[in-house]
UniProtKB/Swiss-Prot annotation:
InterPro entries: Puta_zinc/iron-chelating_dom, UCP006173. Belongs to the UPF0260 family. It comes from Gluconobacter oxydans (strain 621H). This is UPF0260 protein GOX1406. The lineage of its organism: Bacteria, Pseudomonadati, Pseudomonadota, Alphaproteobacteria, Acetobacterales. It holds the Pfam family CxxCxxCC.
Amino acid sequence: MTSPTAPFWQTVPLDQMSSEQWESLCDGCGRCCLNKLRDEDTEEVIYTNVACRLLDTHTCRCTDYADRHRKVPDCVTLTPELLAEIDWLPPSCSYRLLRDGFDLPDWHPLRTGNEKGVHSSGASVQDRCISERRAGPLEDHLEDWPGEWPDRSPLCHALKRKG
């Protein structure tokens, strides 16, 4: 029997979540909205600090989420099916953490009730990125931090699914 107090992300498999539950997993860090390169020889993902032109680099939110696919045709809509295939999500991404059997971090908005923790933990891109409208060549903006665990955040615990 499932514990009535367990949060949904600990009991509901990703592919069975409602759209509201799925969307609420996004912590709003903005790391997935940074441009990435892929090494042609090694297939390694190379991160940059260059944000999609629709990302507000302070709030870390899309300025036109509802119409983003028309304005940015290669914007990815993350689904449980796609989640199984992609390798470029940052290590602190909630979707990746849950996919890989870990719990949400302590600073996640679903745990704290606000978005302050995602910024204070160092998980977000807040004021650490530049819009692609002003950046110039991506090669001039290579960074390691988007692909690393946030400096000011403890690691997550393995998730033992309830139920």
